[in-house]
Regions:
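Phosphate- and other anionic-substrate recognition elements at nucleic-acid/protein interfaces
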Residues: 1-114
Length: 114
């Protein structure tokens, strides 16, 4: 059911905003375990299929690229990512929010799909 809820959430987000013009997502190339890899693969499959169905461009960005753009180091730690976003005036609740903000800044700076 988690994948159906995810697709429903994407559709609701698309309908309750001015629409989604592009999707950037963190491209994880290494997983801690088999379950994590399966879950990630399932979400990525549904995300890319949903984007293609709605003709929305999408791009995965490697974790190291996001970290390097935000901190100058491709292997930056969680505290480094949080500090980088705080330096930009944000107060991320955790490293996941900091990573999402860093990805947003990267996407904006690229000016669209690379």
């Amino acid at each position: 059911m988690r994948y159906l809820r995810f697709k429903r959430w994407l559709t609701e987000l698309n309908q309750t905003t001015d629409g989604i013009d592009a999707v950037y997502f963190e491209e994880v190339r290494r997983h801690a375990g088999v379950d994590a890899a399966h879950a990630y693969g399932g979400f990525m499959a549904h995300l890319t299929a949903w984007c293609e169905h709605h003709q929305i461009p999408y791009q995965g960005v490697p974790v190291g690229t996001i970290k390097k753009h935000a901190t100058g180091k491709g292997n930056a730690g969680k505290a480094d990512m949080i500090a980088a976003m705080q330096a930009l005036g944000h107060q991320p609740e955790d490293d996941n929010e900091a990573d999402a903000l860093a990805l947003l800044y990267l996407a904006i700076e690229q000016g669209g799909m690379a």
